[in-house]
């Protein structure tokens, strides 16, 4: 008899819940249309649902009529976007994750103190673009270990590093180790820039990997943290697939013996996970479902002041 082990925590984090609730509350308070700068979170199911309810997702503020309402996505924005919104007389609401905002604030602070900032992350990811924009003359983005060797700073340059919140813990450990070897005096935040939810989901999955022969990560291909979960399994030689709906689960699984793990990215609704489990039960009728709880998450972020009762 085969088992599917559900890695827990999985799915929505506090920042994603807050961002979605911001859009829902804005639609309820002011009605459609409500404009959202970038996809509120990187998940097609969430975005499509909000679009049906009256949210309009845009990349350029010029697509919003003057005086309109705009919500900034959970990933954050560079300061010039806020300035443009002000110039266009837009009513803006910030749904940036609280933990991303913390990194923005740290980058501004240390840049003002004369530090060069090393930002570990993916250059094209919207979160990194937003953080970089806080101090473009002081920030250098590092994507991989090899980039550390190419940094132009002298050994005595005051250096401060932060990371994108959704990176692989494995990658961050390798890059920060290389950074500290080359620049022993580099400093960072007292706690990791990788958010609690990213850490919990990766560590929860790691804990079940010795018991399984295959992993499904339920998440969107655009989702950074979902892709990193897939990599956690693959680094440990466990076949893994990133799926965003039950339609993506094929009878390929019948070619593998042993138990299966399922986890989900931080922007994945739990109902999609349950649909994927149902699909697996169709393929493997005697499949047993087991929940594996690694940590209990009780983090809640308050809504922006514009939407508080």
Curated annotation (Swiss-Prot):
(2E)-4-hydroxy-3-methylbut-2-enyl diphosphate binds at residues 42, 75, 125, 165, 223-225, 267. It holds the Pfam family LYTB. Isopentenyl diphosphate binds at residues 42, 75, 125, 223-225, 267. It comes from the Bacteria. Binds 1 [4Fe-4S] cluster per subunit. Keywords: 4Fe-4S, Iron, Iron-sulfur, Isoprene biosynthesis, Metal-binding, Oxidoreductase. It catalyses: isopentenyl diphosphate + 2 oxidized [2Fe-2S]-[ferredoxin] + H2O = (2E)-4-hydroxy-3-methylbut-2-enyl diphosphate + 2 reduced [2Fe-2S]-[ferredoxin] + 2 H(+); dimethylallyl diphosphate + 2 oxidized [2Fe-2S]-[ferredoxin] + H2O = (2E)-4-hydroxy-3-methylbut-2-enyl diphosphate + 2 reduced [2Fe-2S]-[ferredoxin] + 2 H(+). Its EC number is 1.17.7.4. The active site is at 127 (proton donor). [4Fe-4S] cluster binds at residues 13, 97, 195. Its cofactor is [4Fe-4S] cluster. InterPro entries: LytB/IspH. Dimethylallyl diphosphate binds at residues 42, 75, 125, 223-225, 267. One of its GO terms (molecular function) is 4 iron, 4 sulfur cluster binding. Pathway: Isoprenoid biosynthesis; dimethylallyl diphosphate biosynthesis; dimethylallyl diphosphate from (2E)-4-hydroxy-3-methylbutenyl diphosphate: step 1/1; Isoprenoid biosynthesis; isopentenyl diphosphate biosynthesis via DXP pathway; isopentenyl diphosphate from 1-deoxy-D-xylulose 5-phosphate: step 6/6. The keyword Zinc does not apply. The keyword Signal does not apply. Catalyzes the conversion of 1-hydroxy-2-methyl-2-(E)-butenyl 4-diphosphate (HMBPP) into a mixture of isopentenyl diphosphate (IPP) and dimethylallyl diphosphate (DMAPP). Acts in the terminal step of the DOXP/MEP pathway for isoprenoid precursor biosynthesis. Belongs to the IspH family. This is 4-hydroxy-3-methylbut-2-enyl diphosphate reductase. The lineage of its organism: Bacteria, Pseudomonadati, Chlamydiota, Chlamydiia, Chlamydiales.
């Amino acid at each position: 008899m085969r088992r599917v082990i559900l890695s827990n925590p999985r799915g929505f984090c506090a920042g994603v819940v807050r961002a979605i609730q911001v859009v829902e509350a804005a639609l309820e308070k002011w009605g459609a249309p409500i404009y959202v700068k970038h996809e509120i979170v990187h998940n097609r199911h969430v975005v499509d649902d909000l679009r049906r309810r009256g949210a309009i997702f845009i990349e350029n503020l010029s697509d919003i009529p003057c005086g309109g309402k705009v919500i900034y996505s959970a990933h954050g924005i560079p300061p010039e976007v806020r300035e443009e919104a002000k110039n266009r007389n837009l009513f803006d609401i910030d749904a940036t994750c609280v933990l991303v905002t913390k990194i923005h604030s740290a980058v501004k602070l240390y840049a003002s103190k004369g530090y060069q900032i090393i930002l570990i992350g993916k250059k094209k990811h919207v979160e990194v673009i937003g953080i970089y924009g806080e101090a473009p003359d002081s920030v250098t983005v590092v994507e991989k270990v090899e980039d550390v060797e190419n940094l132009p700073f002298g050994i005595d340059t005051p250096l401060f590093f932060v990371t994108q919140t959704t990176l692989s813990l494995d990658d961050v450990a390798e890059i920060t180790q290389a950074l500290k070897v080359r620049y022993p005096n580099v400093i960072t935040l007292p706690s990791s820039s990788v958010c609690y939810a990213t850490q919990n989901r990766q560590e929860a999955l790691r804990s079940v990997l010795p018991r399984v022969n295959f992993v499904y990560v339920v998440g969107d291909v655009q989702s950074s943290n979902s892709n990193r979960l897939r990599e956690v399994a693959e680094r440990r030689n466990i076949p893994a697939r990133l799926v965003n709906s039950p339609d993506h689960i094929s009878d390929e699984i019948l070619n593998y013996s042993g138990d299966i793990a399922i986890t989900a990215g931080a922007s994945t609704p739990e109902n999609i996970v349950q649909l994927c489990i149902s699909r697996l039960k169709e393929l493997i009728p005697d499949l047993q479902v087991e929940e594996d709880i690694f940590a209990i998450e009780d983090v809640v972020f308050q809504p922006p002041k514009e939407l508080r009762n």
